[in-house]
Amino acid sequence: MAFLADNISLHMSGFNILRDVNVAINTGQITVIVGPNGAGKSSFIKVLSGDILPTQGQVILNDKALSDWSPDQRARMVSVLPQHSSLNFPFNASEVVALGRIPHQSGKVRDTHIVKEALATVDANYLESRFFTQMSGGEKQRVQLARVLAQIWEPTTTGNQFLVLDEPTSALDLSHQVLTLKIVSELALT
């Protein structure tokens, strides 16, 4: 298994958020987690990404406990688009997408090329120099998707890569919902 949640439980503020969750995710497959609002889907994603430690169980990434990978190594293998992303700094779209390149040391020229490619992939290249704070909700969502794509744009020597998306189409119009699902499907095949 490349990404494994082994007997995950999460107890917070007196509530059982997750209880005995077991999931195996292999590369090349799309795994969808569905459930009603408040069921713990976003909390599970935070456990998978290492943002929250489980009360019980462990997450295994590429045959190694998630906690045994350094933050930089994890960031080169797992890219997460959270349900809500806020950014109140005067960054333009290119600068936001470039944040996904921070864990890499591929050089400014290569990173600039990847940023442009990622923006084009999500149909947001026209937003390149627009400030993030001046974008619509759907435009922000596409720029953030470009950021997480840029983060795993190139293969890494440390192991398989995973894209974890929490409600990635929630703010998108229909055509960009279709585009997002197409991008995810194509990534799963590579």
Task: List each language-model region with its residue ranges.
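Conserved ABC ATPase "signature" region
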Residues: 112-128
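Conserved structural motif at the start of ABC-family nucleotide-binding domains
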Residues: 3-5, 18-20
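Helix-to-loop junction immediately C-terminal to a conserved catalytic motif
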Residues: 49
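Conserved ABC transporter NBD signature motif
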Residues: 57-65
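The feature captures the beta-strand-to-loop junction immediately N-terminal to the Walker
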Residues: 34-36
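Conserved ABC ATPase signature
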Residues: 131-135, 139
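Catalytic Walker B motif of ABC-type/P-loop ATPase nucleotide-binding domains
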Residues: 157-167, 172
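ABC ATPase NBD coupling module
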Residues: 65-79, 89
